């Protein structure tokens, strides 16, 4: 098992397990630290979605730093086993929802929520272009936008060699952060006034 750690918060320095092999590519400790340094002002009390969660390291970091609730979506073994092991090892028994049927099933569940989502993190296999476009287009759609809070962030981890689109529906690309082989693309819902022409325009 590959060992990682929680960076900060309630579970700071606690070890996390990840399976060996090429099928699972956990978000590195360094990239996770950078991500949460950026998210710091909004993590406490937030509602956080960790899609393609793998070992759960990102969502667990959010819990450790005070997120109100985290939704994990992962259906691939042995990553799912590691995710469950990590939650059990840290004795995290509430404040999360685990969807083990995958991202599609999780998006269906999220569509029924009355509580808006503040942060969405997605980390599909880097080569899975359809997973990136499908998930980002969902959150950029009318249905997906409806479950996001007004100032929500949607963040995609991807290869630093890849370039995601500047826009997916109402989601606008606002920031690109590269770190080694990995990159983070940040998206926000376009302001309402930007999604329609001013009165009088044809």
Predicted regions and their residues:
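Class I S-adenosyl-L-methionine-dependent methyltransferase catalytic core
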Residues: 1-202
């Amino acid at each position: 098992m590959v060992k990682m750690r929680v960076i900060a918060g309630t579970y700071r320095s606690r070890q996390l397990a990840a399976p060996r092999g090429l099928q699972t590519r956990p978000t590195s400790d360094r990239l996770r630290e950078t991500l949460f340094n950026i998210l710091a002002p909004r993590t406490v009390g937030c509602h956080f979605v960790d899609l393609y969660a793998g070992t759960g390291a990102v969502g667990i970091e959010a819990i450790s730093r005070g997120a109100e609730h985290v939704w994990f979506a992962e259906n691939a073994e042995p990553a799912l086993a590691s995710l469950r092991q990590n939650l059990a090892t840290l004795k995290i028994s509430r404040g999360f929802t685990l969807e083990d049927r995958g991202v599609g099933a999780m998006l269906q569940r999220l569509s029924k929520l009355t509580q808006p989502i503040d942060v969405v993190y997605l980390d599909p296999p880097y080569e899975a272009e359809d997973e990136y476009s499908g998930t980002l287009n969902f959150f950029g759609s009318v249905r997906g936008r409806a479950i996001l809070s007004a100032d929500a962030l949607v963040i995609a981890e991807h290869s630093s060699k890849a370039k995601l689109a500047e826009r997916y529906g109402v989601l606008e690309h606002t920031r690109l952060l590269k770190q080694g082989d990995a990159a983070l693309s940040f998206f926000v819902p376009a302001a309402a006034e930007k999604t329609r022409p001013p009165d009088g325009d044809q």
